């Protein structure tokens, strides 16, 4: 039920005309709460008249299935310490646990927990293997 609500809300937000003005950034994962911020360029940072930012924030902060939201966003391990190991199946409909650090799930559905090797592209949701760092936030390379 929580997944259906999540998909419905994401579709509603994506179809909103104000959504094109939103730059949505995941700021931090902290315990079981996902903290997000929404902003518009050249705006006074006040809330949107159509309630879009409130809807997005509510989706992330008050989701009934935080483990699923965490896993779908980043594949990071859950606060209780349980996670999916290297090359193990992961994704929506497979498990509500995330991949062990620094791995991420290769696909939202029926993926495998992997990390990005040296010299390969990395970024916000594609983490480098242990001992490597990504030199860019979105279009970096593991070094």
UniProtKB/Swiss-Prot annotation:
Q: Which residues form the signal peptide?
A: 1-18
Domain observations: The presence of 'disulfide through disulfide knots' structurally defines this protein as a knottin. This toxin contains 2 'disulfide through disulfide knots'.
Which segments are removed on maturation as propeptide? Answer: 19-80
Q: Name one GO cellular component term.
A: extracellular region
Which family, according to UniProt?
A: Belongs to the urticatoxin-2 family.
Q: Which organism is this entry from?
A: Urtica ferox
Sample GO molecular function, one term: toxin activity
Localization of this protein: Secreted
Record-given protein name = Beta/delta-urticatoxin-Uf2b
| Superkingdom per UniProt | Eukaryota
Main location group: secreted
Q: Which GO biological process entries does UniProt record here?
A: defense response
